[in-house]
Amino acid sequence: MSLTERVAADLINAMKSKDKVSLEAIRAAKTAFLLALSEKGPGSALTEEEELKIIQKLVRQRRESAEIYKSQNRPELSEKEVAEADILEKYLPAKISDEELTRVVKAVIEKTGAKSISDLGKVMGAAMKELSGKADGKEISAKVKQLLG
């Protein structure tokens, strides 16, 4: 079952259970999928990687909005955004541990032959491909900078 199909099935379940927070989050995902499909053109389909990137983008937007609401002293809106982000995160693959992230980034650094922080771009490109969907770009960047020193 593709991610788009899971979202459609969960949308129906959320409507039946009258869960407003889930319904809003899942509708946002479905809308984003439809928007991406319309941009690709007729007769095309989204790849699993594209679907994951869309969900990651939605989660990141919700988390950033929650931080803004929190800084503006609007806890009720912040809680809503966090709840939606948590619902959307269920569609993402499990995050990898810090030790696993370190191991993968070290392997990428060896493979690319990076020696200093000036090789950051080369390492980041390879690391993002390898860790797509498993770790956040900020986490990967921080780990690469830490290891390159």
Each predicted region: which residue ranges?
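Charged, compositionally biased, marginally structured helical/coil segments
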Residues: 1-149
